[in-house]
Amino acid sequence: MAVSLWQQCIGRLQDELSAQQFSMWIRPLQAEMDGDTLVLYAPNRFVLDWVRDKYINIINQFFTEQMGSNAPKLRFDIGSRPSARPVAPAPVAAKPVNRQTKAQVGTTSFNTQAEPIINPNHRSNINPTYQFDNFVEGKSNQLGKAAALQVSENPGGAYNPLFLYGGTGLGKTHLLHAVGNGIIKNNPNAKVVYMHSERFVQDMVKALQNNAIEEFKRYYRSVDALFIDDIQFFANKDRSQEEFFHTFNALLEGNHQIILTSDRYPKEIDGVEDRLKSRFGWGLTVAIEPPELETRVAILMRKAQESGINLPDEVAFFIAKRLRSNVRELEGALNRVIANANFTGRPITIDFVREALRDLLALQEKLVTIDNIQKTVAEYYKIKMADMLSKRRSRSVARPRQVAMALSKELTNQSLPEIGDAFGGRDHTTVLHACRKIAQLREESHDIKEDYANLIRTLSS
C-alpha cells in the first residue's frame, strides 16, 4: 500500500518539479516497505542529502494528505532496495540486442569478447589524469559532477543518455574522462570509447571509402560506453546523423551508457535533426556554467598546489575576480604567472601578477563595464537602455534590470553602492536583493539560467 502511495507521490513530484530536477533527484530513488516504514534508497550520499534537505517536507505532506495519521514513517538509505526493480519510473528499454559473453556490473552489460574494429586504441583516449578527485566542484558544476559520478558507478542506469552543455573550458571533457576512468576501474574489461564528434564523422567517411560500413556499425554498436564531445559538430552532416541515430538506439536498447557534450542546450543546436535532439533529452540534461568566484579561487589554489607553488590567498582572489569566463583561461593565466616567477626569481605578489598579466587584465577591464552590461542586457531582452535607469517595476523591465545588476556584481569590480548608482541611484540593498533573486531563479528556471549563461558568454567573448 505504502509503495503504491510512493508511486502516486512520484506523480505529484513530477508535476511540481522541473524535468531536470525530477530526473536528477527523484527518478534514481528506489522504495521498499520495512514494517511501518517506507525506505527510500538513494544511489549515493549526495543524492540522499539533497532529497532529504529539499524534498522531505513535500513527500511527508503528500503522505499526510493521503493517509492522515496512518501515513508511513520515512527513512533514507544508500544503495539499492533488496528486491526487484526500482519503483521510480524510468524510460522503457526496448529488447536488448544480442551479445556474446558478458560480465555484469551494476545494470550495465559489458562485452568482453568483441574486439575494436575501427581503432583498437580507442580506450587509450580516456585520459587517466582526469579524475573526480581533481575536479574542483562548485555551485556552477555541482549537478554535472553528481550526475557524472552516478553514471560512473551505475552506467546504463537512470541517467542515460547524460547530456552536458556549456561554454568552452568549463570542465565538460574532464567529467567525460572521469566517468570513463571510473567505469574502467570498476570493470577493466569494459570497452569505453571517448572521442570528438569529428572523429566519428572521419571514421564513418573512411568506412564508406573502404566499403566497410558494416564493420563500422558493428564496432560502434558493440561498445559498453560511448562518450562524444561537441556533438554540435554533427550539424548539417546528414549521413553522420543518420548513422549516429541508429548507433544511439542500439546502445540504449542494450542499456549501454551514452554521454554527450555540447556548447548549447540540445534544442538550440541548429542543423541537427529533431529526432536526434529529442533523444538527447531522454535521460538527463545538465548545464555546466562558468565558475563563480569561490570556485575560481579554488581552481587556482589547486592548480598552484599541483605545480608546487605557494599561491597567496590575496593573489588568487585578485586573479579570480578579473578572469571569469572559464577554467582554461584561469589555468593559462596562472601558468604564465608561474613561468614569469620562475624566470625572474621574484615572489608572486599582486603587483607581480598585475605586471605579468597586464595585457590580459587590460583586455578584460576594457570589455566588461556596467555600461556595457546594461547595453548588452537591454539589447538581449529588447528593452530600452533608459529602462535600466527608470523606476518602472513591470516584470518585463524589472527582471532584465535585476539580471544586469547580478551580472555587474559578478563581472565587474564595482561595489554594491557603485552598482546601485549606475542603475539610477538605487540603494545597495536593492542590488543585493536583485543578485539573490537572480541566483534563486537560475536554480528554478531553465530560461533564466540559459539567459544568464548566454549573456556571460557574450560579455566575456
UniProtKB/Swiss-Prot annotation:
Residue segments, region Domain III, AAA+ region: 125-341
GO terms (BP aspect): DNA replication initiation; regulation of DNA replication
GO function terms (MF aspect): ATP binding; ATP hydrolysis activity; DNA replication origin binding; lipid binding
Function text: Plays an essential role in the initiation and regulation of chromosomal replication. ATP-DnaA binds to the origin of replication (oriC) to initiate formation of the DNA replication initiation complex once per cell cycle. Binds the DnaA box (a 9 base pair repeat at the origin) and separates the double-stranded (ds)DNA. Forms a right-handed helical filament on oriC DNA; dsDNA binds to the exterior of the filament while single-stranded (ss)DNA is stabiized in the filament's interior.
Keywords, ordered alphabetically: ATP-binding, Cytoplasm, DNA replication, DNA-binding, Lipid-binding, Nucleotide-binding
Family the entry assigns: Belongs to the DnaA family.
Region (Domain I, interacts with DnaA modulators): 1-90
Residues annotated to bind ATP: G169, G171, K172, T173
Organism this protein belongs to: Shewanella frigidimarina (strain NCIMB 400)
Localization (cell): Cytoplasm
Gene3D superfamilies for this protein: 1.10.1750.10, 1.10.8.60, 3.30.300.180, P-loop containing nucleotide triphosphate hydrolases
Protein name per UniProt: Chromosomal replication initiator protein DnaA
Residues covered by region (Domain IV, binds dsDNA): 342-461
Subunit structure, interactors included: Oligomerizes as a right-handed, spiral filament on DNA at oriC.
Domain of life where this protein originates: Bacteria
PROSITE patterns membership: DNAA
Note on domains (UniProt): Domain I is involved in oligomerization and binding regulators, domain II is flexibile and of varying length in different bacteria, domain III forms the AAA+ region, while domain IV binds dsDNA.
NCBIfam families, per the entry: DnaA (TIGR00362)
